[in-house]
Design a protein with these regions (language model features):
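Conserved nucleotide-binding/hydrolysis micro-motifs of P-loop NTPases
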Residues: 52-53, 87-90, 185-189, 325-328, ...
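Conserved P-loop NTPase motor module
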Residues: 454-513
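Conserved ATP-driven motor cores of ASCE-family P-loop NTPases powering translocation/secretion/packaging/pilus
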Residues: 224, 388-392, 397-469
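Glycine-rich phosphate-binding loop of nucleotide-binding enzymes
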Residues: 123-204, 410, 458, 489-490, ...
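P-loop NTPase motor domains
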Residues: 186, 190-192, 210-386, 452-456, ...
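Loop/turn-to-beta-strand initiation segments
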Residues: 175-180, 316-318, 358-362, 394-399
């Protein structure tokens, strides 16, 4: 049985194909969905601004009469606002070229209509919550569009990012996705999510085989920068010679460090004897010292028998790289290394070459503003941008998560054609996001500061039309919640009190003895 439609107002004189002004004698909410019937179509609209007015209060009212006016004004309230035209419900949200005529009736959109728009799982969608103004209407997003067009999850600290990302992860795992999380704070290693009784979280070993590094990645570990031209030249030559010898079988992989340092020592001796390069000797000694320091400093990170991190990734698993115990420099190198390898291996598979990765991967970068910074150049930023530009062709999706959008590289952010934006208060953050997302209107931006925890603006290719959504609670548990300082202080003091009681009891027993 069809729902009875509720008329809430009419269109006013001024309208365009994309926007219409309206008046309503009923209380209507910002963000509510409405239906308009014109051009033989059922057109969905979204109330993007609203104001309230009464003719009883004018600029010259007498303050002493305000109480009398209040008693009768509630019966003469009118609501004025703007409706954004979203499209024809029955024609894939195609926007009619003709604006709605003045006087067109406006109805509250039925739940059935909204379900038709925001959909159900067709095998490629996941539910992330319900409409903010209609709790009975679930909101589904398209996983293929998330992976191919990328995603950004943005909010202030405590706005609900961790729960939102967890909901996305759980939905993808139900589709047997290979999800990779670059976990900056160790929140996801304890993520408790089970499929058929099995915990599907896989912690990847944070070990690197230097043989698998690119020269630029290796050079970064050795602290040889772009301006150290002479050191760079000799280290590059020694590194490539060593890798070629390992690849050809001339030496075993466990001889890597010895051969590398041996090459540099040979160059040092050549510089001693050859007057043409004698001025290079000091630089060669310097880079040899850096390699020795590097081998010692990263002895726990490097493993000459470790298989590549990318080869450890599995489908139907939450694959986690825990960066909570390493500094930003190491995190930068590893993220760039993994993204580079993912892109190269997916290209090989798609083009039919051996050594490729046979399944798509969705990578989630927490604290994305650190490694894809708007002000600092990092190796990661380059590969994040590469994956964002090329990933859709090869089944590589990217999710950027940040509580500091203004510090996030606008080029990387603009490549995320899907966004889940929770509460954002800072105007500079709002402007930065709007600059990256051309479809984000000023009216929608204004709503971001008034969102409550867990409420979000969801937009992009993954959803038919922008929506204000109440994100559902994730089923899995993780350690991303705020810690209670008061509770922890109380526990410490209780331990001290218990210890003092034990000491007092001990001395009391001694005295009796």
């Amino acid at each position: 049985m069809a729902e009875k439609r509720e008329k809430i107002g009419v269109c006013l004189n001024e309208s365009t194909p994309k926007e219409v002004f309206f008046i309503s004698p009923k209380k209507v909410s910002l963000g509510e969905y409405v239906e308009l019937n014109y051009e033989s179509a059922c057109v969905l609209g979204f109330i993007k601004s609203i104001s309230c007015s009464t003719k009883l209060f004018d600029d010259d009212f007498d303050f002493d009469d305000i109480e009398k006016l209040k008693r009768i004004s509630n019966r003469r309230l009118f609501f004025y606002g703007k409706i954004s035209i979203l499209g024809d419900v029955d024609k894939n949200m195609f926007i009619p070229r003709v604006p709605p005529p003045p006087g067109t009736d406006i109805y509250l959109a039925s739940s059935d209509t909204l379900r038709k728009v925001f959909g159900r799982d067709d095998g490629k969608k996941i539910c992330i919550g319900s409409l903010l103004t209609r709790e009975d209407v679930d909101v589904y997003v398209d996983v293929d569009q998330i992976v191919s067009r990328h995603l950004a999850v943005l909010a202030v600290t405590g706005g609900g990012k961790s729960n939102t990302v967890s909901v996305i992860i759980e939905g993808m795992l139900e589709k047997s996705a290979a999800v990779l999380v670059f976990d900056m704070h160790g929140e996801y290693v304890n993520f408790n999510y089970r499929v058929d009784g099995e915990n599907v979280v896989k912690r990847l070993e944070l070990k690197l085989n230097p043989v698998h590094l690119s020269y630029k990645e290796f050079r970064q570990f050795a602290n040889v920068d772009d301006n150290s031209f002479i050191q760079d030249r000799y280290l590059r030559r020694a590194f490539r010679t060593t890798i070629e010898d390992i690849s050809s079988g001339a030496i075993q992989v466990d001889a890597f460090w010895g051969r590398l340092k041996g090459e540099l020592e040979m160059y040092r001796e050549q510089a001693r004897e050859d007057p043409d390069i004698k001025d290079d000797r000091r630089s060669i000694i310097g880079v040899l010292n850096k390699v020795e320091d590097m081998e010692d400093a990263y002895s726990e990170l490097f493993d000459l028998f470790q298989k590549p991190i990318v080869d450890q990734i599995e489908p139907a698993r939450l694959n986690v790289i825990d960066f909570s115990h390493v500094d930003e420099k190491i995190a930068d190198i590893i993220v760039s290394h993994v993204l580079r390898n993912l892109l190269e291996k997916r290209k090989r598979f798609v083009h039919g070459y051996d050594g490729g990765l046979e399944f798509p991967v969705f990578s989630i970068l927490e604290e994305a503003h650190i490694l894809a910074s708007s002000s600092v150049n990092t190796r990661s930023k380059y590969w994040i941008s590469r994956v964002a530009r090329e990933g859709r062709k090869f089944g590589l999706g990217l999710c950027l998560v940040s509580q500091r959008p203004k510090a996030l590289d606008v080029n990387a952010l603009s490549q995320a054609n899907n966004m889940i934006i929770l509460k954002l208060v800072e105007p500079s953050d709002q402007r930065h996001v709007q600059q990256a997302a051309e479809s984000l209107s000023s009216e929608l931006v204004e709503q971001l500061s008034s969102l409550n925890v867990g409420e979000a603006l969801v937009m992009g290719k993954m959803i038919p039309v922008p929506a204000l959504v109440k994100i559902k609670l994730a089923r899995g548990k993780m350690s991303g919640n705020d810690r209670s300082a008061v509770e922890e202080w109380a526990k410490v003091m209780q331990k001290k009190r218990d210890l003092m009681k034990e000491i007092d009891s001990f001395y009391s027993d001694e005295e009796e003895f």
